[in-house]
Amino acid sequence: RFNETVAVSQYEEGALRYNAEEKAEEFRKAEEYNKSISGQDVQDPFLPGSGAVLPDNYEEILDVDMGMMGTLEIPCIDVVLPVYHGVSEEVLRKGVGHIQETAFPIGGEGTHAVLSTHRGLPEARLFTDLDMFYIRIFDEVLAYETDEIQVISPSDLSQLKPEMGKDYVTLLTCTPYGINSHRLLVRGERREYVPEVKEEIQARTVHTERYMLAGITVLILVVVAMAGYSTYRRSKKRTGKKTGKN
């Protein structure tokens, strides 16, 4: 989590260096890219040799700092992850990757961006049990509400195609843990960004974590007390036996 936090901070600092005209130009280039790859088949990022020939400038578009194009925030599990260009092994080890054959996650009708990560990493948080998630590109925040979760075969990625009039972002990862024979898709549909909604989710998450921490603390105290009482009983029995012998 520390490295992810540092990367997110680097992105936020880098985004501040762009003025309004420069940001508008980056969005324009991203929109052009999205139009150019419309209708292109999506390749499974976890299969060796997958991928398509892409424009030479792909990694330059929306590149704020060190290959990062934005951040993904999932308030219900209290996590913010950096989003990088591409889905190389190196990228997936340190954050979320953008599948190149899909739209840049800048929103817009008829777009379907796909982001991927390694579900199996011990320190990774799962893309499950989501409610709302948020994409930040520069200072623009896009809100998505989970509307579909499904498990598919890696040979059938037709669900990742864009739909007319829809604005989707799908989070893709391997499943089940340790086997990785299928793909878990968590799709979100664009909603109006309301900061108060995100704050409410964050507050709910904090309360839940506090209750869990309190419960764990009580459980530990009970276990310690039981262990102490058991030790006391054994010690008392030994003392009683010695007294009886005397």
Residue spans for each PLM region:
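C-terminal single-pass membrane-anchor helix
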Residues: 200-246
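Solvent-exposed, non-transmembrane regions of membrane-associated and secreted proteins
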Residues: 1-211
